C-alpha cells in the first residue's frame, strides 16, 4: 500500500528518503529539484536521519499512475461500483431469514461488510466452505466474518458469496445503491491537476510514462547522474580508466 505524508520545513531533516522541492530553472521556469538528498543526509548525519531505502516508492508510483489513467470520473465510477457490491451484499444479509439469524455489524461501510453469524459453529462452517472454494475471507472473531469487495469482484462472486452465507444465490441489483452518510461524501473536486485529466487511453498512458522516463539522466544520454559519490557527474570518457588492468 502506498503511503503519503506531509511535514513542515522545520521537520524536513527528520524525514527519510529524498525530498523533492519546487524551484526555478535558468530560464525562470518552474522546476522540480532535489531539496534534500542522500549525500546531504550523510554529511549532516548528526542533524538528519539516515536515508531509508526508497524501493517502496514503486507502490506509490503505481497508485499515482492508477489515478492518472482512470482520472477523477474513473476513480469515482470504480469506487461506486465497489460500494454497490458491498451495499447489495449487506442488504441480502439483513433480509435473510432462517434458523441462524445473520446480521450486519456496521451501519456505515465502504467496501467491507462484517457479518455476525450468531454462533461460532456457523461462522466456522461458512469460513471453511469459502476457503475450500478459494475465497479468502477474514475471521473477524469467533462469530463474525468480514467480506471485502474490490475492483476485481464480479457478479459471479456475488452469487457465490450470497450462497455461502444465506444458502441462496442472489443476483446483483441492476441499480447501484450508495448507503454512505452524506457527511462522509466529498463534494469538492478531486484530482483536478491536468495530468489526471489527460491520459485515459493505453497509448496516451504509455507515451506519458515514456516522457517521464526520458526526463531521467542515463549513461547513454548524459553523464552518470546516480551511483557512488566517486562516480557522480563524470563524463563517459573519464570513466574509461576504471576498465584498465593497471
Question: Would you name each region that the model predicts?
Answer:
Residues 1-96, 105-107:
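Active-site C-terminal subdomain of aminotransferase-like
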Residues 6, 10, 18, 62-70, ...:
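Generic, well-ordered alpha-helical scaffold segments in large soluble proteins
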Residues 129-133, 137-164:
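Noncatalytic alpha-helical scaffolds and linker/capping helices
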Residues 155-225, 229-237, 242-245:
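Flexible inter-domain linker/hinge segments
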Amino acid at each position: 500500500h502506498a503511503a503519503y505524508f506531509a511535514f513542515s520545513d522545520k521537520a524536513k531533516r527528520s524525514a527519510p528518503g529524498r525530498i523533492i522541492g519546487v524551484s526555478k530553472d535558468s530560464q525562470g521556469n518552474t522546476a522540480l529539484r532535489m531539496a534534500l538528498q542522500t549525500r546531504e543526509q550523510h554529511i549532516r548525519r548528526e542533524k538528519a536521519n539516515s536515508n531509508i531505502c526508497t524501493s517502496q516508492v514503486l507502490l506509490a508510483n503505481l497508485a499515482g499512475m492508477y489515478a492518472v489513467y482512470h482520472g477523477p470520473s474513473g476513480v469515482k465510477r470504480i469506487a461506486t461500483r465497489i460500494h454497490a457490491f458491498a451495499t447489495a451484499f449487506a442488504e441480502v444479509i439483513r433480509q435473510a431469514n432462517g434458523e441462524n439469524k445473520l446480521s450486519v455489524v456496521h451501519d456505515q461501510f465502504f467496501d467491507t461488510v462484517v457479518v455476525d453469524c450468531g454462533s461460532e459453529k456457523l461462522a466456522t462452517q461458512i469460513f471453511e466452505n469459502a476457503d475450500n472454494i478459494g475465497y479468502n475471507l477474514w475471521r473477524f472473531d469467533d462469530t463474525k466474518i468480514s467480506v471485502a469487495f474490490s475492483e476485481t469482484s464480479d457478479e459471479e462472486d456475488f452469487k457465490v458469496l450470497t450462497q455461502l452465507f444465506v444458502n441462496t444465490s442472489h443476483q446483483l441489483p441492476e441499480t447501484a445503491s450508495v448507503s454512505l452518510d452524506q457527511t462522509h461524501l466529498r463534494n469538492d473536486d478531486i484530482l483536478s491537476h491536468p495530468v489526471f485529466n489527460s491520459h485515459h487511453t493505453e497509448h496516451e498512458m504509455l507515451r506519458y510514462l515514456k516522457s517521464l522516463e526520458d526526463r531521467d539522466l542515463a549513461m547513454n544520454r548524459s553523464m552518470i547522474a546516480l551511483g557512488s559519490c566517486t562516480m557522480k557527474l563524470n563524463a563517459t570518457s573519464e570513466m574509461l580508466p576504471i576498465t584498465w588492468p593497471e
